[in-house]
Amino acid sequence: LNSPYDRYAHGDSKALNPDQLEGLNVFRSFVARCSQCHTPPLFTNQQVAVMGTPEPEGMPIDIGAQATAGAERFPVGFKVPTLRNIALTAPYMHSGRFGTLREATEFYTKGRGHAVPEGEENEAQ
């Protein structure tokens, strides 16, 4: 692995520019909480997460991992994807709800996400 992040993580303090460092700080913050599920070096914990991402208006609910045998305790949960090369994989979220990384990031930094959809109980607790 040889991305600017990888070089930075291995001690090259000049591998990330100021904007990238600011993004890394948001990524690691308790506000966005990205690093709780998107853990380096693959930037995924390979688990299922229930994020509370709303479905696009007019679309049926995607039950996600609940459709997988043995995953009934994860209603509307989805496998945490890697964030490697994320800028090349738009749109974002399981439903493609967000067209830009900024929109996806703001979903988490503005207090949304990491929540059970309105009217549902968190069965994973």
Residue ranges and their predicted role:
Residues L1-Q125:
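Periplasmic c-type cytochrome electron-transfer domains
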